[in-house]
Curated annotation (Swiss-Prot):
This is Mediator of RNA polymerase II transcription subunit 18. One of its GO terms (cellular component) is mediator complex. InterPro entries: Mediator_Med18. GO terms for molecular function: transcription coregulator activity.
Length: 208
């Protein structure tokens, strides 16, 4: 099995070949309302957007040690909306001094034949999950607060069960490469959410 889902920002208009600046954390279920109240006061949209997405993670194994990973996601709450294909690169080497995790992010809208296309290309589905939660915006930054649900029957998002008694919290911004000042903005906003949630740089390799 590949590592648990890392970053599950809701489906939205994606931008090709950009850098993602990311901090992550979690809160227990009982802390949700306090965090949402705090975010309403800090963010541009007083009431958060809600989202419910079904994501499948596909692997392509080759000669390299690590498989190539792509993520296919579809919104469950917006019938007819496009699927999205997402690639998340490895954290940039030498970014220890940066305040956030930094990695390449490719996000494109596709038709609903995406799963079949990936299988024809030789990918196999490793795991799938449902993410349901709230999305706030602050300038170029996004804050997603969501719960991950385990899919019990392959391909069927209905009846998915909560994976834990907590919510994941992701603070991110997507911008062209070289705009490292974005990392400072993300870290500064994260400081305003303490002590409700501790957002940190989490290297996906630590989860494997």
């Amino acid at each position: 099995m590949e590592a648990p889902p890392v970053t599950t920002m809701p489906v939205s208009g994606g931008t090709i070949n950009m850098m993602e600046y990311l901090l992550q954390g979690s809160i227990l279920d009982q802390g949700l309302e306090s965090l949402l109240h705090r975010l309403r006061g800090l963010c541009d949209n007083m009431e958060p957007e809600t989202f419910a997405d079904h994501e499948s993670v596909y692997l392509l194994k080759g000669q390299q040690a690590s498989p190539f990973v792509l993520r296919a996601r579809r919104p469950l709450d917006r019938p007819g909306a496009p699927w999205h294909l997402r690639y998340l690169g490895q954290p940039e080497a030498g970014d220890r001094s940066r305040h956030t995790l930094v990695r390449n992010c490719v996000d494109i809208a596709t038709s609903d034949v995406l799963p079949e296309f990936l299988q024809e290309m030789g990918f196999r589905m490793d795991h799938e999950f449902v993410a349901r939660g709230h999305l706030f915006r602050k300038g170029v930054m996004k804050v997603a607060v969501y719960k991950v649900f385990r899919v019990l029957v392959a391909g069927a998002a209905e009846g998915a069960e909560p994976l834990s008694l907590s919510y994941l919290v992701e603070l991110s911004a997507v911008a062209p490469a070289g705009q490292d000042n974005i990392a400072d903005e993300v870290r500064g906003f994260a400081e305003q959410l303490r002590p409700l949630v501790q957002l940190e740089k989490i290297d996906p390799k630590r989860l494997m």
